[in-house]
C-alpha cells in the first residue's frame, strides 16, 4: 500500500514539475527567438535621391543619384542609378521657341518620377546646371538666356520634386566638378567604399588624377599641381571632401569646345576666299553649306574679323580636301602660344602650372577616340593617334559613308577634324609631350557611372545636405547581449534541474512528503 502511495506521489510531483519546467523552457526559447529575430531583422534601406540635369551646348541629360542618409565624413557616398538623354538640342537652341521647353523636358522628368519612390519625391532635390552653350548665349543675349532659364524653372517646378533652381554654372565649376567625379570613381578620396561593395584601396596617400573635359563649346583642364602656386589666384579652387582639403588648378576655355573650335577654323579658313572653303579637315568629295550668319554673328568667331565683301553672302560652301597634315597646321593657328605673362602658360596667355600626375579625359575626348577605335588599350601613344588620323582623313567621303553608314552624317563628317583637334589641343594647347601623353586615360564610365561634372556637383552638394542618424536596431547592443545571456542561463538552468529531478532515487520523493 505504501509503495502505491509513493508511486502516485512520484507521478503527481513529476507532472507538476514537468509542467513548470516545460513552461519555463518554452518561455526561455520564445524569448531567445524573439530577441534574435527582432534585433537582427534587416533594417529598411535608408537612402536619399538627387537629380541633376546637365544642360550642355548640344543636348541635355538627366542623371539620378542616390546615397545613404547617414554620410561619411560629411559627404554622401553617391552612386548613379539612372541616365536619360533628352531628345533635341541643348536648351540654348530654344532661343526662338521658348514655349517648347515644357514638352522638351517632359519625358525625362516623367522617367524620374517612375525611378524614384513616390514617397520620396517631395524630399528629392533637382538641380539644373547649364554649361558653355548657355554661357555663350548669355554673352550674346543675356535677356534671352534669362528667359530660357525661367522657362526651364517653370517646367521643372510642375513636378513633385524639391526643385533647387536652374542656373548657368561657371567654367571653373564645370572643370572642378569633373575632377571630383574622376577621383571619386577611382577611389582617390575615401577608403570606406562598402556601400559601393568595392575593394578599398590600401594606399591612403595615392595622388589624385587630373581631369580633361571636352564639350561642344568649351574645354576644361583641372589637376592638383605638384607645388601650390599663387601666380594666378583665379585659377585656384578649394574643396573639402570626406574630411580632407584639396587645392586644385582649373581653367575653362570658352569657344574651344570642338563645335565652336570648328566654327573658328572655318571663319579663319574663309579669309582670302570667294566664299568657297577648301577644307583639309573634311574628307575629299564631301560638301556642306552653312549660313554666313553662323560665322559673322557668333561670339566665338567675332575675333576672326571677316572681310566686308563676305557679308552679302547668305551661304558659305565647304568642300573637303582630306589632308591630315594641312588640317593639323590650320588648327594650330587657333592657339596663340607666343604670349605668356606668367612663368608658364597653356595658350592665349592663360597660366598653366607644370602638368603633374595621371589624367582622365572624358566627354568628347572619349567619344572621338572610341570612334577611332583607340579606347580598348590602357594608353594610346601620339604615334598611334597620328597614324590613325592620317589614314582616316585621307579616305574619300563615299568610302567613309560605306564603312560607317550607321553614324549620323554631321558627326561622321567631323571626326577627322575632331580627332586632329584633340591631338593639337593636348600637344600644342596643354603641352603634353609624347612621354606625358601616356598618362592620359580616355574614360567614359567607371563602375557603371558616367564620368562628367554632374556627379561631382551632386557630391559637393551633399556637403550641404544634413546627415541623418543611422538606422539602428530596437535595443542597444549591451541590452541585447544582457538579455540573450540571461534567457540562455534560464534555459540552461531549467534543463539541469529537469535532469537532476528525474534522476533522483525513490527516497527523494519520500522526503518531499
Curated annotation (Swiss-Prot):
It catalyses: a ribonucleoside 5'-triphosphate + 2 H2O = a ribonucleoside 5'-phosphate + 2 phosphate + 2 H(+); a ribonucleoside 5'-triphosphate + H2O = a ribonucleoside 5'-diphosphate + phosphate + H(+); a ribonucleoside 5'-diphosphate + H2O = a ribonucleoside 5'-phosphate + phosphate + H(+); ATP + 2 H2O = AMP + 2 phosphate + 2 H(+). GO terms for molecular function: ADP phosphatase activity; apyrase activity; ATP binding; ATP hydrolysis activity; CDP phosphatase activity; CTPase activity; GDP phosphatase activity; GTPase activity. Its EC number is 3.6.1.5. It is a multi-pass membrane protein. Disulfide bonds join 255-300, 281-327, 340-345, 393-416. Its cofactor is Ca(2+); Mg(2+). One of its GO terms (cellular component) is caveola. Keywords: ATP-binding, Calcium, Disulfide bond, Glycoprotein, Hydrolase, Magnesium, Membrane, Nucleotide-binding, Transmembrane, Transmembrane helix. Glycans are attached at residues 73, 227, 245, 307, 336, 373, 460. Residues 38-481 are extracellular. The chain crosses the membrane at residues 17-37, 482-502. Its main location: membrane. N-glycosylated. The N-terminus is blocked. The active site is at 174 (proton acceptor). Residues 1-16, 503-513 are cytoplasmic. It is an enzyme of class 3 (hydrolase). It comes from the Eukaryota. Catalyzes the hydrolysis of both di- and triphosphate nucleotides (NDPs and NTPs) and hydrolyze NTPs to nucleotide monophosphates (NMPs) in two distinct successive phosphate-releasing steps, with NDPs as intermediates and participates in the regulation of extracellular levels of nucleotides. By hydrolyzing proinflammatory ATP and platelet-activating ADP to AMP, it blocks platelet aggregation and supports blood flow. Homodimer; disulfide-linked. Belongs to the GDA1/CD39 NTPase family. This is Ectonucleoside triphosphate diphosphohydrolase 1. It comes from Bos taurus. The gene is ENTPD1.
Amino acid at each position: 500500500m505504501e509503495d502505491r502511495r509513493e508511486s502516485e506521489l512520484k507521478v503527481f510531483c513529476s507532472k507538476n514539475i514537468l509542467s513548470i519546467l516545460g513552461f519555463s523552457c518554452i518561455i526561455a526559447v520564445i524569448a531567445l527567438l524573439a530577441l534574435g529575430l527582432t534585433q537582427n531583422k534587416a533594417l529598411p534601406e535608408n537612402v536619399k535621391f538627387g537629380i541633376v540635369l546637365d544642360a550642355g551646348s548640344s543636348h541635355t541629360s538627366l542623371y539620378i543619384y542616390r546615397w545613404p542618409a547617414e554620410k561619411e565624413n560629411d559627404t554622401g557616398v553617391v552612386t548613379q542609378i539612372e541616365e536619360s538623354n533628352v531628345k533635341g538640342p541643348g536648351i540654348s537652341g530654344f532661343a526662338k521657341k521658348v514655349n517648347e521647353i515644357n514638352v522638351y523636358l517632359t519625358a525625362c522628368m516623367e522617367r524620374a518620377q517612375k525611378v524614384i519612390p513616390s514617397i520620396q519625391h517631395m524630399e528629392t532635390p533637382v538641380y539644373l546646371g547649364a554649361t558653355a552653350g548657355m554661357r555663350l548665349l548669355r554673352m550674346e543675349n543675356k535677356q534671352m538666356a534669362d528667359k530660357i532659364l525661367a522657362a526651364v524653372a517653370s517646367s521643372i517646378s510642375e513636378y513633385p520634386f524639391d526643385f533647387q533652381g536652374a542656373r548657368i554654372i561657371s567654367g571653373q565649376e564645370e572643370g572642378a566638378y569633373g575632377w571630383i567625379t574622376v577621383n571619386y570613381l577611382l577611389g582617390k578620396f575615401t577608403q570606406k567604399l562598402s556601400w559601393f561593395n568595392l575593394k578599398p584601396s590600401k594606399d591612403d596617400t595615392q595622388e589624385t588624377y587630373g581631369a580633361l573635359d571636352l564639350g561642344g563649346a568649351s574645354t576644361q583642364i583641372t589637376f592638383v599641381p605638384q607645388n601650390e602656386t599663387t601666380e594666378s589666384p583665379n585659377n585656384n579652387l578649394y574643396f573639402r571632401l570626406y574630411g580632407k582639403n584639396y587645392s586644385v588648378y582649373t581653367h575653362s576655355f570658352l569657344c574651344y569646345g570642338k563645335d565652336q573650335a570648328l566654327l573658328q577654323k572655318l571663319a579663319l579658313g574663309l579669309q582670302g576666299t570667294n566664299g568657297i572653303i577648301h577644307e583639309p579637315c573634311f574628307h575629299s568629295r564631301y560638301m556642306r553649306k552653312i549660313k554666313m550668319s553662323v560665322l559673322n554673328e557668333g561670339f566665338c568667331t567675332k575675333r576672326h574679323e571677316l572681310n566686308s565683301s563676305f557679308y552679302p553672302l547668305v551661304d558659305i560652301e565647304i568642300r573637303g580636301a582630306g589632308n591630315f597634315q594641312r588640317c593639323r597646321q590650320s588648327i594650330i593657328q587657333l592657339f596663340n602660344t607666343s604670349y605668356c605673362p606668367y612663368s608658364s602658360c597653356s595658350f592665349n596667355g592663360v597660366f598653366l602650372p607644370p602638368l603633374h600626375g595621371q589624367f582622365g579625359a572624358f566627354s568628347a575626348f572619349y567619344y572621338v577616340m572610341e570612334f577611332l577605335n583607340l579606347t580598348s588599350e590602357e594608353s594610346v601613344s601620339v604615334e598611334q593617334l597620328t597614324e590613325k588620323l592620317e589614314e582616316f582623313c585621307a579616305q574619300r567621303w563615299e568610302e567613309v559613308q560605306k564603312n560607317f553608314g550607321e553614324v549620323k552624317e554631321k558627326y561622321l563628317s567631323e571626326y577627322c577634324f575632331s580627332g586632329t583637334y584633340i591631338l593639337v589641343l593636348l600637344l600644342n594647347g596643354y603641352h603634353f609631350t609624347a612621354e606625358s601623353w601616356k598618362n592620359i586615360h580616355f574614360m567614359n564610365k567607371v563602375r557603371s557611372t558616367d564620368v562628367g561634372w554632374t556627379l561631382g556637383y551632386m557630391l559637393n552638394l551633399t556637403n550641404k545636405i544634413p546627415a541623418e542618424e543611422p538606422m539602428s536596431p530596437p535595443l542597444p547592443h549591451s541590452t541585447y547581449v544582457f538579455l540573450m545571456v540571461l534567457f540562455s542561463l534560464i534555459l540552461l538552468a531549467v534543463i539541469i534541474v529537469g535532469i537532476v529531478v528525474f534522476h533522483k532515487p525513490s527516497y527523494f520523493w519520500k522526503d518531499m512528503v
